[in-house]
UniProtKB/Swiss-Prot annotation:
Keywords: Aminoacyl-tRNA synthetase, ATP-binding, Cytoplasm, Ligase, Magnesium, Metal-binding, Nucleotide-binding, Protein biosynthesis. Tetramer of two alpha and two beta subunits. This is Phenylalanine--tRNA ligase alpha subunit. The keyword Cytoplasm applies. It comes from Saccharolobus solfataricus (strain ATCC 35092 / DSM 1617 / JCM 11322 / P2) (Sulfolobus solfataricus). Its main location: cytoplasm. GO terms for molecular function: ATP binding; magnesium ion binding; phenylalanine-tRNA ligase activity; tRNA binding. PROSITE patterns: AA_TRNA_LIGASE_II. Binds 2 magnesium ions per tetramer. One of its GO terms (biological process) is phenylalanyl-tRNA aminoacylation.
Amino acid sequence: MISMLSENEAKILFFLKDLKKTNSVELAIKMGIPESSVLSLIELLREKGYVKTEVKSEKHYVLTEEGRKRKESGLPEDILINTLNGQEKDLNEIKNILNKDFNIAISWAKRKGLIDIKEGKVIPKVKTYMSSEYLALSNLERADSNTINLLKKRGLIEEKERKIVSVELIKEPKESEIGISNLNRELIISGEWKKYKLKKYNVEAFPPYYTISKKHYFREFLEKVKDIMISLGFKEINTGYIEMEFYNFDLLFQPQDHPAREIHDSFSVEGSGKIEDKDLLNNVKEIHEKFWKYEWKQDITLRLMLRSQTTATTARVLASRPKAPQKVFTLGKVFRPDAIDATHLIEFHQLDGVIIDNNFTFKELLGVLKEIFYRLGIKEVKFKPAYFPFTEPSVEAYGYLEKLGWVEMCGAGLLRPEILSSVGIDSTAGAWGIGIERLAMSFLNISDIRLLYSNNIEYIRDTKVKIE
């Protein structure tokens, strides 16, 4: 039975017809394919009786990591001469330019007679220079033995052994033994196709799987949430991760001895901030001392921290004394010390929103929240009374999810008059904060919060976001 030749096998035999004998390295270059592929093809041809092979070991030189670096940047002595450009310079000036290459450059330049050093100055003997070692780094095959020895001495190349398979043609193929996989118009019209064997196709084989780029599912979820807020007429705002305790706590009517300020509940950052608005600072101080009955300290309020709630961004909005009506939101990371497990992370996302409007009511706030959750795909929502330091009245919102039942979604309420009066806002304001990771876990059917940040490529490809 005649064994059909593949197109690449036929190509190798075609090259050998002229060369008679060659090796795997040359064939790989001629065919433009990896040597490993050529070796596999040669072995198939040997088994079919078309070629004979012989394996030889050959020593050759390759660039070390330092050699690759010098090939890109140049050798230190070359850089030194080109830096001098025919002019003498102070040793210290050269040292500052060459840094860690200074000693190597001076040593080799003196050894090669390229410079003199007198009275703390480097005096070049040539204006330009390019060493033979540098030129050899780009073409080791043509380098002479002296240059090779220098490169080895300098640790720029290393000797390695490789196996080369020499190939010799012993039988030429017949046209009927050559298979083709692409039947084109020319072959059909000319009738040439009759001389070849057509490669068999497995019609039951699955087509190749092509992966297309897509957003990370959690990033896609975050963007969908932003789109919903913008579609409801809210404007997005963002502030930095590092915040003063003033905006994270004090302006939100949270006393300076509150447990949330303890080291186990927030991350401290070295240094302190500055608040230009002294009237605002004094207003907050007076309100704290009047209602909380303690001595408010400015050095505490100016301390820096990683924000523990995006309500700090809401606080900055309030501090800018915006005029009603205003509808803004922020979606960003917050940071809290915690033991990382399936339900806790030390950094996570919060969605905070605030509406400032004349005569804005608590009932309207609940309506806005229901609409947000409805657009997120949560059709059933209920509210329970709650307590938060900066809102009154306050509620917790719960949404019904098929697999989990009633799940807490957010905390919300009307901002306390103590907060609004400190920033000089006469209108009513409603605010809320939503834990985004909890929502995302529900929508993506994820039981481990760490999977929201997975870098497992297969898992990322297979996970989809769908919000009805």
